[in-house]
């Protein structure tokens, strides 16, 4: 049996400007990060082989170093899980471009399409969301 978690629209590092005070927004951002860690704990407990993140991992093109470091370190801490990432309309193709050492278990799709084999029973194929400008 193949166990895969599909998640999307995490919107990590959101500013939460419209509804919260600065302190409430920071508290909410921390809760988002803890929810990600809880998802990973669930994945470990259930012996999940892969996690597919289908868009809008982050809320804007500019991601704080703290959030990026947290996200990448949590992936590195779980080499037994393969992570597959498709950009959404809030993500940018530069999201991971300047990261020097991406975890070996993080697989990025592209707007040209890409395929990854999780094991002998599951092939993941995807085409990322592309902006109008990227499509030209």
How would you describe each model-predicted region?
Residues 50, 61-136:
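His/Asp/Glu-rich metal-coordinating catalytic cores
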């Amino acid at each position: 049996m193949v166990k895969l978690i599909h998640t999307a629209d995490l919107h990590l590092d959101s500013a939460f400007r419209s509804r919260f005070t600065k302190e409430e927004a920071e508290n909410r951002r921390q809760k988002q990060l803890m929810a990600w860690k809880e998802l990973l704990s669930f994945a470990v407990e259930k012996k999940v082989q892969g996690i597919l993140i289908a868009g809008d991992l982050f809320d804007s093109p500019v991601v704080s170093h703290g959030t990026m470091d947290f996200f990448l370190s949590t992936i590195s801490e779980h080499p037994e899980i393969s992570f597959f990432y498709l950009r959404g309309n809030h993500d940018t193709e530069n999201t991971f471009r300047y990261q020097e050492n991406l975890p070996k278990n993080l697989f990025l799709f592209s707007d040209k399409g890409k395929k990854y084999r999780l094991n002998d029973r599951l092939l993941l194929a995807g085409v990322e969301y592309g902006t109008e400008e990227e499509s030209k």
